[in-house]
């Protein structure tokens, strides 16, 4: 066994950050980069002409709207660890892309707004983490703003999400009265002070032991007494820390802080890195694949075309699951059943790219894609020909017919729509008999329609009109050999095919779905399909 290989893989930590929009996910991401030395100044405000854009928000439409539309991959070193952050879209309309990104993560950091508690998107993304049994760490952000009662916040997480919590630290006050956080293990209080620069630099923190008289004077007798009462309560009322339960995704360690003011970030990072694990074995068609003892293998979880105007190309993002990647190596592509060389391997810090000579299990690399890869594809070496578990495609919830305004640009239009669909931002469906002469687009959230229109115009020079169609539900026909043209009671149903030729049915409401199932014995419908 190569000791360097084991050492490199063991120092990897690969995680995603999930949250509801505006909970502070992008700000927290930037502060991690700040501590890792990957950036010198955090662009703390997005969307204003006089401010920097967030490092992780790089597409034009993201800059205009101040939202993370695509998923970026950010790597940096900190305290001997090599950290890979899978920065997921924070906007509620981009949960399917976020879902695929969570398939590549070993753990998740859940950011919660202290004034709001658990919100809709948090619930949806949390369920994905539970499905994968990955550890979930909670960072309750914006403690320096008006916040809900701390015990209420913990109860909210446990009741709504159904996961036990264990506070690692505890806040002293909140809002204008926020004085700092108490580390339950070391009994040290780190005091808070707002930073006039908006947290663009690392905050100066003063530490006091809980028994230090100076702390009581600083906090004030009323707040100090209230804090001591709360500490007695949590010692008896909350779960004890159990690292095995944490790693099984059954117990969430909770931290408090203010990402904007760079407060509580370093403490969180230090605990998080020690409590999480390096990459672990993944399930495949040949059982669990060990990350250290098995040769290089990876799977594609995202495809992005035309990442910026200087690079008219298509990049496949792949998560390395085992072994070591070396530039120029030949790999077996399971889907096409042939050997290929991975071209132009690179790691990305948003728009900035660097060519990589080597990478290890836990890392994410982007490789040039000659229209070969699809989401979920497995790559192997060493004579192995297994496949990792497929990534499900979830049923979209909004549908439009795409009308091309300039028939002379048909070729660019079809190429653009197809490429954007292969990236996973949209799903394309064709009329069952009409083929590509009529294209229906399905999306998880309506903002993706704007992204499609914007990208077709800016990147492919095609203007389109989107016409809503009166359907809200889509289901895959489980048995693709069924002739959907012979189904009964389908006058209000639209029959379509996906890009792989699988038959689907579009419905106006759930009642119609029930009627079709009742009148077609043996028909089974699915809400998602594995790639």
Residue spans of the language-model regions?
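Structural and coupling elements of P-loop NTPases
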Residues: 1-531
């Amino acid at each position: 066994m190569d000791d360097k290989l084991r050492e490199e893989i063991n120092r990897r930590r690969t995680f995603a950050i999930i949250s509801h929009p505006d909970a502070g996910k992008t700000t927290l991401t930037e502060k991690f980069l700040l501590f890792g030395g990957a950036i010198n100044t955090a662009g703390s405000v997005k969307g204003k002409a006089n401010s920097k854009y967030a490092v992780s928000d790089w597409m034009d439409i993201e800059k205009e709207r101040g939202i993370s539309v695509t998923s970026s991959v950010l790597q940096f070193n900190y305290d001997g660890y090599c950290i890979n952050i899978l920065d997921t879209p924070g906007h509620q309309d981009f949960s399917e892309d976020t879902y695929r990104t969570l398939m590549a993560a070993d753990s998740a950091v859940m950011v919660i707004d202290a004034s709001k508690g658990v919100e809709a998107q948090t619930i949806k993304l949390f369920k994905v983490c539970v499905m994968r049994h990955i550890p979930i760490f909670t960072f309750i952000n914006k403690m320096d703003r008006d916040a809900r009662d701390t015990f209420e916040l913990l109860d909210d997480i446990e009741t709504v999400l159904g996961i036990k919590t264990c506070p690692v630290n505890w806040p002293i006050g909140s809002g204008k009265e926020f004085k700092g956080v108490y580390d339950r293990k070391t009994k040290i209080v780190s005091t808070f002070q707002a930073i006039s620069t908006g947290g663009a630099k690392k905050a100066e923190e003063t530490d006091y032991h809980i028994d230090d008289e100076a702390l009581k004077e600083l906090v004030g007798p009323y707040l100090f007494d209230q804090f001591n009462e709360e500490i007695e309560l949590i010692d008896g009322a909350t779960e004890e820390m159990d690292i095995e339960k944490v790693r099984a995704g059954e117990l969430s360690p909770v931290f408090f802080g203010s990402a904007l003011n760079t407060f509580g970030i370093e403490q969180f990072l230090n605990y998080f890195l020690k409590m999480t694990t390096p990459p672990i074995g993944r399930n495949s068609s040949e059982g669990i694949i060990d990350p250290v003892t098995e040769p290089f293998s990876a799977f594609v979880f995202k495809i992005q075309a035309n990442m910026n105007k200087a690079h008219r190309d298509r990049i496949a993002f792949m998560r390395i699951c085992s072994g070591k990647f070396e530039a120029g190596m030949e790999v077996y592509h399971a889907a096409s059943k042939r050997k290929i060389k991975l071209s132009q391997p690179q790691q990305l810090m948003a728009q900035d790219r660097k060519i990589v000579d080597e990478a290890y299990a836990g890392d994410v690399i982007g490789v040039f894609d000659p229209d070969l890869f699809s989401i979920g594809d497995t790559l192997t070496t060493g004579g192995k020909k297994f496949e990792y578990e497929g990534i499900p495609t979830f049923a979209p919830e909004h549908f439009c017919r795409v009308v091309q305004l300039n028939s002379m640009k048909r070729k660019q239009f079809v190429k653009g729509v197809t490429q954007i669909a292969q990236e996973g931002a949209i799903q394309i469906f064709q009329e069952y008999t009409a083929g590509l002469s009529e294209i229906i687009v399905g999306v998880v959230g309506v903002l993706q329609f704007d992204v499609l229109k914007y990208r077709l115009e800016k990147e492919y020079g095609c203007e389109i009109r989107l016409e809503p169609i009166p359907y809200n539900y889509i289901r895959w026909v489980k048995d693709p050999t069924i002739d959907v043209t012979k189904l009964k009671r389908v006058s209000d149903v639209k029959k379509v095919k996906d890009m792989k030729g699988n038959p689907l049915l579009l419905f106006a409401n759930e009642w119609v779905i029930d009627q079709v199932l009742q009148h077609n014995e043996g028909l089974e419908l699915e809400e998602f399909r594995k790639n």
